[in-house]
From Swiss-Prot:
Its EC number is 1.7.-.-, 1.11.1.-. This is Myoglobin. Heme b binds at residue 89. It is an enzyme of class 1 (oxidoreductase). GO terms for molecular function: heme binding; metal ion binding; nitrite reductase activity; oxygen binding; oxygen carrier activity; peroxidase activity. Residues 2-141 form the Globin domain. One of its GO terms (biological process) is removal of superoxide radicals. It comes from Cyprinus carpio. Nitrite binds at residue 60. It catalyses: Fe(III)-heme b-[protein] + nitric oxide + H2O = Fe(II)-heme b-[protein] + nitrite + 2 H(+); H2O2 + AH2 = A + 2 H2O. One of its GO terms (cellular component) is sarcoplasm.
Amino acid sequence: MHDAELVLKCWGGVEADFEGTGGEVLTRLFKQHPETQKLFPKFVGIASNELAGNAAVKAHGATVLKKLGELLKARGDHAAILKPLATTHANTHKIALNNFRLITEVLVKVMAEKAGLDAGGQSALRRVMDVVIGDIDTYYKEIGFAG
């Protein structure tokens, strides 16, 4: 079974609450790695204790998870999805690759807790994200961004 399939087995729980789960992912990312909150200008002024209930954080978290869902459902054939995302994250947002690694670990933990992603699924999600991050790195190099 393809790694994406293992993760998608639990994806229904994520889709049922994109905002709640996405808000949890970003809230944990920002609390565990406060430097990442500074990468989102609209979230800079939000106090740590106000992140979880913030509508904008939840909405952006939902956007992140919906894009991840597209990538998973593409089952590795994701160039058309990933190249524009990599381009904006390089040229507009200036997001270094390590930040994708940080959010991967948060995603793994939140999906384990909220969607029942088991140990095999967690390993599969890490492998999927390793491929995605490797491809982002390739696109970054193509456009001259030292991410």
